[in-house]
């Protein structure tokens, strides 16, 4: 009897959670005073800057041109590298470790600057027999890594608000 009640309670809980649309960390919200900011980069049309702009807009942030009295997110440096992670018996590369690191600065409207950075690592199977598929897969992985780093930067900006409030 008790086991059937536990099972029924578990099924009811799962049904309620899946029916109401509740998800773990689906999205995060930017503080209201930072809902308008400028995105600054050396190359405003490179892949990462475009993805960062899109991710900010998905989080209801209005990205504007450089103005006075608004926060600025400056992308300082984007570092990409790949290292051999494993090799085949005959000495060819089998697997690579792809790394993407972005260093940025978040400057508040009052002029205070806070450095933030994010880093993502992925492995990539380097199949020499499928050269075209390999390059396409590699580009998909790099784009996914850029999106993940952009999400990490947004989360760190939101966490920065709590750090500033504690001062």
UniProtKB/Swiss-Prot annotation:
Please give the coiled-coil regions recorded for this protein: none
Per UniProt, the keywords (alphabetical) are:
Cell outer membrane, Lipoprotein, Membrane, Palmitate, Signal
Name the InterPro entries on file.
Answer: LPS_assembly_LptE
Residue positions of covalent lipid attachment, annotated as S-diacylglycerol cysteine: 20
GO BP annotations, alphabetical order: Gram-negative-bacterium-type cell outer membrane assembly; lipopolysaccharide transport
Question: What cellular component terms from Gene Ontology apply here?
Answer: cell outer membrane; transporter complex
GO terms for MF = lipopolysaccharide binding
Does this entry carry the keyword Oxidoreductase? no
Q: Which PROSITE patterns match?
A: PROKAR_LIPOPROTEIN
Assembly and binders = Component of the lipopolysaccharide transport and assembly complex. Interacts with LptD.
Name of the protein in its database record:
LPS-assembly lipoprotein LptE
Which species is listed as the source?
Answer: Haemophilus influenzae (strain ATCC 51907 / DSM 11121 / KW20 / Rd)
